[in-house]
């Protein structure tokens, strides 16, 4: 197999690693394919401006989520997850914005190259962290809805914060190992190891994380459907969890197809690199919109504060009008539990 352009570009001798590849394409290279199997045409010049505009909009949205979920809204187990998810998405979008900004100008020298390499490493780490948080959110939400009494009685204190810390640590370790084999060992010494790391990352993302986020969502949908037959209104938090998982699955289709076709059938990628990266940026930018749409009160014609909208998106249980005929509201149960359980 010829030289592999891994998830992150090689730190030295880039021309040898990716001969004939334009700088723009090299920056947007996702890395699953060898140079012989990716298109040599660079992305359109307008792509950099689209990336920058999308990243800036996503940074504003995730910044609002960080502010309201972190300082303005009472902490709940799931607001902790969404807080870390917004942090991962915000840092990822910032790294992509830096790369797009460098791509738009003629920045030469060692310092811009160093910034590009650091931005790629940070982007990979935060992308992995954001994806790994989705299974944790899906599983915990599924358990809290299907087994509410058991969940709130047995739930360890500070579970959300502990899980988020472990997932960030896992992301840091995986990214460090990947960059050790694909960047610091040198291209000649790390070719096979870097290739195996790319395969391992794909297996981890598509064959472990995706099932772990999809199966709990399916169980949640079945449970919500059963409640709908009893005329019980579903919690808005269920809609939020299902929506953010669906957005990720849709936005990662192109990346998954490219990876699957190449590693299973040895078929070149049918989609340009910048298309898959654009979809991932859309995924990172869309979550604040999901929170807003889920928390918006359709009957409220006047403008509502964003704090109220985001707080309503975290509503866990039936609407007030249905409280008498619904199962125990997990928000009420949360208020009855020690404050440490909301961490």
From Swiss-Prot:
Extracellular topological intervals: 1-44, 105-123, 182-198, 264-273
Annotated region (Disordered), positions in chain: 318-343
UniProt family annotation: Belongs to the G-protein coupled receptor 1 family. Mas subfamily.
Gene3D superfamilies with a match to the protein in the record: Rhodopsin 7-helix transmembrane proteins
Stretches of the chain found on the membrane's Cytoplasmic side: 67-82, 145-160, 221-241, 295-343
Protein name: Mas-related G-protein coupled receptor member F
GO MF entries: G protein-coupled receptor activity
Keywords from the UniProt entry: Cell membrane, G-protein coupled receptor, Glycoprotein, Membrane, Receptor, Transducer, Transmembrane, Transmembrane helix
CDD domains in UniProt: 7tmA_MrgprF
Gene Ontology CC annotation, any one: plasma membrane
Feature: compositional bias, Polar residues: 324-343
PROSITE patterns the record matches: G_PROTEIN_RECEP_F1_1, G_PROTEIN_RECEP_F1_2
Source organism of this protein record: Rattus norvegicus
SUPFAM superfamilies linked: Family A G protein-coupled receptor-like
Main location: membrane
